[in-house]
């Protein structure tokens, strides 16, 4: 994973996703890493030929919406998060990274079948869509436990200081 996406894993905004809860006590960051690992495992176990680097990068960025979806407001009612966050994640990821068509497909289509008209077109998107559903279920029912959110300020150096403090 590190070889495929060092720019993502070390970016300030990706590190900020440790400060937002996704499901249960799982952060968005942990969830995206889980989905990435499971996506690779699915492709390996089922011998699905795919572009692994794009699979990993798309999985890491599939929930790159960069806000706490549990807090609703007039523009982001929390009960509609599932419908609109793929577009927000794609916009955010596109503004920071040069995405391939496969990576865009993964990010934009990962909520299918909820987003009925956004059918995945490549096998990488189908794999991530499947892995995302499985991870979401296991995280929601607390079969997989997270560590809760981390207070994160805006820089990589600040994040490393927080992690060092927590380890001690």
Task: For every predicted segment, state its role.
Residues 1-168:
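Metal-dependent phosphohydrolase cores
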């Amino acid at each position: 994973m590190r070889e495929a996406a060092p720019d993502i894993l070390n970016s300030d905004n990706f590190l900020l996703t440790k400060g937002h809860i996704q499901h249960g006590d799982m952060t968005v960051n942990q969830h995206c890493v889980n989905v990435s690992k499971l996506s690779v495992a699915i492709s390996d176990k089922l011998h699905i030929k795919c572009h692994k680097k794009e699979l990993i990068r798309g999985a890491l960025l599939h929930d790159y919406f960069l806000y706490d979806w549990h807090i609703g407001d007039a523009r982001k009612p929390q009960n509609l998060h599932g419908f609109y966050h793929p577009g927000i994640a794609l916009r955010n990821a596109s503004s920071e990274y040069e995405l391939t068509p496969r990576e865009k497909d993964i990010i934009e289509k990962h909520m299918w079948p909820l987003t009925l008209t956004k059918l995945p077109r490549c096998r990488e998107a189908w794999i991530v869509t499947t892995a995302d559903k499985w991870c979401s279920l296991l995280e929601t029912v607390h079969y997989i436990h997270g560590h809760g959110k981390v207070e994160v300020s805006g820089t990589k150096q600040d994040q490393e200081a927080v992690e060092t403090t927590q380890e001690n």
